[in-house]
């Protein structure tokens, strides 16, 4: 069987606090490591999706409704469901990596980086499916 958990692949989070949220794989570790002896992936995802925007709304209201809250987390493959979609959002690997979980300041910086990149992509109007809440 081929390896399909690759960076850029959109996944659904199945377990935990962010269950039902969409995320994108930043880095995949198929063979596991010493501290995590199972296959896992570093993902960046959307915690709070942008709200619906209509034509009569003003600029300020649209700006407020277009905000996204992001998360960065390491997940076991068992808790991720891959989709057929992939997005090419260029997250800075020096900011978003596995080392951020040791220091809260680095983690918030990584979260901010993901938020900025997600909002940029959302405003261009590409990858619409990724920025819509999963109805279930």
From Swiss-Prot:
GO molecular function: structural constituent of ribosome
InterPro entries: KOW, Ribosomal_eL27, Ribosomal_eL27_CS, Ribosomal_eL27_KOW, Ribosomal_eL27_sf, Translation_prot_SH3-like_sf
SMART domains for this protein: KOW
Pfam families, A to Z: KOW, Ribosomal_L27e
Entries under SUPFAM superfamilies matching the protein: Translation proteins SH3-like domain
CDD domains given in the database record: KOW_RPL27
GO CC, one annotated term: large ribosomal subunit
KOW domain mapped to chain residues: 5-40
Keyword Cell cycle tagged: no
GO biological process, one term: translation
Main function: Component of the large ribosomal subunit.
Family (UniProt): Belongs to the eukaryotic ribosomal protein eL27 family.
Assembly and oligomerization: Component of the large ribosomal subunit.
Protein name per its UniProtKB record: Large ribosomal subunit protein eL27
